[in-house]
Amino acid sequence: MIRFERVSVRYEGTERPTLSGVDLTVPEGELVLLVGPSGVGKSTLLGTVSGLVPHFTGGLLSGRVTVGGRDTRTHKPRELADLVGTVGQDPLAHFVTDTVEDELAYGMESLGLAPDVMRRRVEETLDLLGLAELRDRPIATLSGGQQQRVAIGSVLTPHPRVLVLDEPTSALDPAAAEEVLAVLQRLVHDLGTTVLMAEHRLERVVQYADQVVLLPAPGAAPVMGPPAEIMKVSPVRPPVAELGLLAGWDPLPLSVRDARRGAGGLRERLADASPPETASVPEPPAPRKAPGEPGMPGMPGAAVPVAAERPRTGRVAPLRGRGARGPPPPPAPPPPPRPGRRGGAGRGGARPA
């Protein structure tokens, strides 16, 4: 259905191509998941399918991308609208009408379909996506999952054979994401639509994919295969697959259900195992003290003895820092003698006659 033949894409001002040597085929009627680290060109690859690359984004596209026999380099996006539908991360950025029903009909109006055909397809899409009760609702009042379903419905009414989605659930909560994924499964299994999608939250999608395309690095050739096999070599994988890799399970689990099935033998092995003994921490040595002097509390084993010198009357010992230089300052002079009390004898003197 989708054929990439030695496809490379280079944008102006970049030293290396974003895509290089892409040569693969996406079969018809399958859900194919595109994975890889950020910045490897996933959105660029999706854009070559819809014709947005290079017609809108610019850049140099070499090689050939064909969808249903049409070359996307020689066919502009409007000439592919009846064949390829595109849904992005933010549906609000693509809506052009105010209500659900009008949005579903807009794409068909642009293609010039007959009014009776438009009405029939709108009703079919409302029922397929569970939007019948929302047909007259303003789009701005819908939840995130409902808006994404409307966005998918708006590109389904022209009956495209290919649906391209760029992280359709990344901005949705888990409940809304489940709504969107349920719709995609119905499109693949009930209508035979070919779905090519990139998704950051792999734990939500990977168990539903028929095949996975891995872009390991910018400009690197992609790798395509079954999800469990690709997850073994992918630099990004869902947590449950990471657990299976650490436990040595083969094939890797792609869902919690798969992990529970694969954990049966692990539970049996751990049933008779005793927990490892915790290593005892040795007691720190007692602090040493100077002979005949009390110790100063400090780090274990490193008590500091107090100075042996005693303070003397009439002398001030300055506290000197570590970096002080030069001789110590002279001692302070002794205090003057105290005068005798008025009307009394002075200190050590005789009482006046």
Where are these regions (language model features)?
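Conserved catalytic motifs of ABC-family nucleotide-binding domains
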Residues: 159
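Catalytic Walker B motif of ABC-type/P-loop ATPase nucleotide-binding domains
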Residues: 163-166
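Hydrophobic anchor residue at the start of the ABC signature
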Residues: 152, 180
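ABC ATPase C-loop
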Residues: 155-156
